[in-house]
């Protein structure tokens, strides 16, 4: 099925965002693991895998619309400490929420409800990511940065 070029552009834009998130989260997870923040590392790694599933869904839709995926991620923003990582990831997710809101609008305007439904699903996931990241910044503020870090060293699964 031939897709609308404007919708395909949004699908590829979303794919680039997801590829960036996969890589950024994966690097941050490995850094946290290296520093001994195992609980945080496990959660961030799961986020990376979730973003990979998002990318897969986007590629499937792009191929369904007889288009070619753009596999070039955007520039990564790697934090030098946990606080910077959380802030970098929060900015990435806030940008993704804005991008998905625009993509929903464009898909709707171009009568591509299949793509619109996909964008809505991914938007909800990104909003959940924003919520979790905002909770982390709140915990850092309430507990203090050092105490927050002590809550992230658990090796329990």
What are these regions (language model features)?
Residues 1-157:
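Iron-associated oxidoreductase/ferritin-like identity signal
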